[in-house]
Swiss-Prot record:
It is found in: Cytoplasm. It catalyses: 3-dehydro-L-gulonate + NAD(+) = 2,3-dioxo-L-gulonate + NADH + H(+); 3-dehydro-L-gulonate + NADP(+) = 2,3-dioxo-L-gulonate + NADPH + H(+). Disulfide bonds: none annotated. This is 2,3-diketo-L-gulonate reductase. The lineage of its organism: Bacteria, Pseudomonadati, Pseudomonadota, Gammaproteobacteria, Enterobacterales.
């Protein structure tokens, strides 16, 4: 089905206010959920909203909490999210990293005791729109087996890198082949995954999203490489924030909350002039996209460039929402 941005935001706002969230916070949170969905990231927008409300009702998310600065070391700051609303706090932390970068050339904010930030790419994009390189990542509850194991002991720990090119170039990737959100999107659409995304119950690689969602044997990105990246991203976030690791979140908490996150902004213009920056970035993009195609009907894509098109299409034609997901939200 199709809905407008206004309908989507109003639905989110209604549910948030009905759960006791104050009107200003509810409006800002609903806006971010709706913007994420409008951008085409359904898995971490509208599809994720019922799960967000469940955690709000369970007390994992404290809606009136505000992040608190703990330590300041020039370009590096350490903050405590105090289990505040994840997407609103993440936006504030990237804003703070940008402020630090404006003063020092680079800014790093390490955040502990945080909640799920929903679409991580929003915060990289936020920096790139202002001309900064944006880098951020988060740890999570253990939802992926390390390479060679059956049990979930590492997080998908998504990493975002956004570059202020025209259009913005951005990688937004979990350390698994697919996020659990994308498994859900494909399952709801009745699609197999385009490549193997995990193991079935017999230990064979599979493209069936529903099987992987159920048994939790999701495949690390690049096999052992994604497994290793997940581990070191967790270690860095834990140390810099003095926060909880994947092991602590999984073993000590009843659900995924109290996680650790990193936000980095780099002011490119302190290192290179604007015209030179733009020319260098354009040459890189042209060089890549001019390569001979393996399939003449399939263009060579650059990461993040599709979001401008998706946003325009959704504004023109309405936002696609799965019927079952919309029914869940209406019932909240």
């Amino acid at each position: 089905m199709k809905v407008t941005f206004e309908q989507l935001k109003a639905a989110f706002n209604r549910v948030l206010i009905s759960r006791g969230v104050d009107s200003e916070t509810a409006d800002a949170c609903a806006e971010m959920f709706a913007r994420t969905t409008e951008s085409g990231v359904y898995s971490h927008g509208v599809n994720r909203f019922p799960r967000f409300i469940q955690q709000l009702e369970n007390g994992d998310i404290i809606p009136d909490a505000q992040p608190k600065r703990i330590t300041s070391l020039g370009a590096i700051e350490q903050w405590d999210a105090q289990r505040s609303i994840g997407n609103l706090t993440a936006k504030k932390m990237m804003d703070r990293a940008i402020e630090l970068a404006a003063d020092h050339g680079i800014g790093l904010v390490a955040l502990r005791n945080a909640n799920h930030w929903m679409r991580g790419g929003s915060y990289g994009w936020q920096a790139a729109e202002k001309g900064y390189i944006g880098i951020c990542w988060t740890n999570s509850i253990a939802v992926m087996p390390p390479w060679g194991a059956k049990e979930c002991r590492i997080g998908t720990n998504p990493l975002i890198v956004a570059i202020p090119s025209t259009p913005i170039t951005m990688v937004d990737m979990s350390m698994s082949m697919f996020s659990y959100g994308m498994l859900e999107v494909n399952r709801l659409a009745g699609r197999q995954l385009p490549v193997d995304g995990g193991f079935d119950d017999e230990g064979n690689l599979t493209k069936e999203p529903g099987v992987i969602e159920k048994n939790r044997r999701i495949l690390p990105m690049g096999y052992w490489k994604g497994s290793g990246m997940s581990l070191v991203l967790d270690m860095i976030a834990t140390l810099l924030s003095d926060g909880a690791s994947v092991a602590e979140v999984t073993e000590d908490n009843s659900d995924e909350y109290g996680i650790s996150q990193i936000f980095i902004a780099i002011e490119v213009d302190k290192l290179i002039d604007g015209p030179t920056r733009d020319a260098k970035l354009q040459r890189i993009m042209d060089y890549v996209t001019s390569a001979e195609r393996a399939d003449e009907n399939q263009a060579i894509r650059l990461p993040g460039h599709e979001f401008t098109t998706l946003l325009a299409e959704n504004r023109r034609n309405g936002i696609t929402v799965d019927d079952s997901v919309w029914a869940k939200i209406q019932a909240l």
